[in-house]
């Protein structure tokens, strides 16, 4: 009779011993999840998830979004503020949506796997200058030369926590000049606003939507032209075009730019440089006529 309780005790001890590794693993897993989700302070930041990453508290992220957003509206030339606003507002919804769009595309998945970077050295700009006129590469490098810009000026993503999402935003940022070349929109405030409206309709990134409000800072003629011509073009083409984040630009350099536009479903907008030139010429003629009229009045009064 006494041996039965002893056997029961030994069985219980053995059962607990067998379960201990499983319990320890479960506790460790719970601790890891809690640590990953716990709040932290500016004095106790978690380690960065990738080189250059700066983890932010919710308060810091909100402050960065509000501050950079307001100041970038006041001074649209501050690219650093625009970049900070983009990163502060890109998560948790908008960049993950772009990543999911890339994962749904065979080309997008290859981009995420290869993680190419767009720089002067990676693109081999001298080779692009030798490509036939009308190709994507030749159009892109001609646009760079005409506007006096390089692909090496894009800031590195710092405030997006997920490493893959950070790359998606970096890829979007480095592809921006290709969007300019594809649409032939110049690097002037009016051109940037029109392109940002197109990007917002296509990507839904909040930064691109905020940048569209810079239209209120345009001159009257530019603002009227944006509302009448380029905003309708941007909304129509941005919504109907394929996800431009999925273009593997490095593989399209020898593609005819007209064919790529058709493949993406993008119509080129009216030539903004020509429209701005016509406006300047008309303004110059009006000023000349006013001067001549004033000179005529002065001569008649003598």
UniProtKB/Swiss-Prot annotation:
Source organism superkingdom: Eukaryota
Enzyme Commission (EC) number: 4.1.1.130
Coiled-coil blocks: none
Pfam annotation, one family: Coq4
Membrane topology: Peripheral membrane protein
Pathway assignment: Cofactor biosynthesis; ubiquinone biosynthesis
Transit peptide per record: 1-19
Residue span of region Disordered: 268-302
Record keywords: Lyase, Membrane, Metal-binding, Mitochondrion, Mitochondrion inner membrane, Transit peptide, Ubiquinone biosynthesis, Zinc
Catalyses which reaction(s): a 4-hydroxy-3-methoxy-5-(all-trans-polyprenyl)benzoate + H(+) = a 2-methoxy-6-(all-trans-polyprenyl)phenol + CO2
Cofactor: Zn(2+)
UniProt cross-references to InterPro entries, sorted A to Z: Coq4, Coq4_euk
Biological process according to GO: ubiquinone biosynthetic process
Biological role stated in the UniProt entry: Lyase that catalyzes the C1-decarboxylation of 4-hydroxy-3-methoxy-5-(all-trans-polyprenyl)benzoic acid into 2-methoxy-6-(all-trans-polyprenyl)phenol during ubiquinone biosynthesis.
Subunit relationships: Component of a multi-subunit COQ enzyme complex, composed of at least COQ3, COQ4, COQ5, COQ6, COQ7 and COQ9.
UniProt name for this protein: Ubiquinone biosynthesis protein COQ4, mitochondrial
Species assigned in the record: Pyricularia oryzae (strain 70-15 / ATCC MYA-4617 / FGSC 8958) (Rice blast fungus)
Biological classification of the source: Eukaryota, Fungi, Dikarya, Ascomycota, Pezizomycotina
